[in-house]
Amino acid sequence: MMPRILLSLCAVLSGLLTIQVYAQSLSTDVRSFDDMIDAGTLKVAVYENFAPYSFTVDGQAKGVDVELAEQIAQELGVNLELLWVVPGEKIDDDFRNFIWRGHYLRKDIRADLMLRVPYDREFSNRRNELGELVNELVVMFGPYQRERWLTVYNSRRIKSLETVGVFQYHPVGVEEDSVPSFYLLTAFAGRLSSNVKHFVSPTAAFAAMQDGEVDAVMAMRGVLEWLLSQTNNAQLKKSEAAYPNLGQAIWEVGMAVHESNRQLAYAVEALTEAMIADGRMQALYDKYHLSYEKPEMYQ
């Protein structure tokens, strides 16, 4: 009996050692703050084709997050290298590919800092079936914006939009597999579902509204405000409608680093706090014709 117990104990200890060695190997290639400063380059991950936050025009990077990354790099006295993120099915995939492990095709590419990630205690503290933190190798910090859902409508088709109940009678465009899609399909006991039209992106839904295919679009406020700024159609209006039973209609956007690189997180958070306090963050959003709402801790 005793040898069997010892063998089992050895197996457990061996497994724990393997996990520890694996975890250490994941941190080995993560640049420290000092290494990043010495290299003279800050690698920042931003989402690809995500106007107004990070996108390209004629090969030139633009957007709120791009300019925020430029400002951070400038304040740190280093050059900026952007890493463009093609979003995975879940943000956990993006953390794995750009923060703690690297993409399976390019494990040598890893970001020092990632922008536009959820800043939410419940999300950060999620645990798997074994009770382990889902993203134990990631630190989410530094909220710099509050985002929310918004509906834009064609006022020639809908006189006023005070409740989403109006979509019992008017078609509304949403991005497929999005929160607005799930919400509108189930709201009012499913009575809106026949008028919910799906598109590959909010941009495609917005174009369909301009063409008269749908009478409204529900998507992220920043995205819709940007699209509104790119059109001269005065008939398109923002709705102040509430979204009953939506759940999280407002959320905060922050940043992420590898858990071993908290020194960078402290430095970057100090910089963004200063930008929020002195109005530079507001000015950055104004430049892209966006409403800017401070995170709760700064209000």
What are these regions (language model features)?
Residues 8-18:
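Bacterial N-terminal signal peptides
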Residues 48, 144-150, 221, 229-269, ...:
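Periplasmic-binding protein-like
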Residues 80-90, 174, 192-201:
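Short beta-strand-to-loop elements that line the ligand-binding cleft
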Residues 82-164:
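Acidic, polar ligand-binding/catalytic clefts
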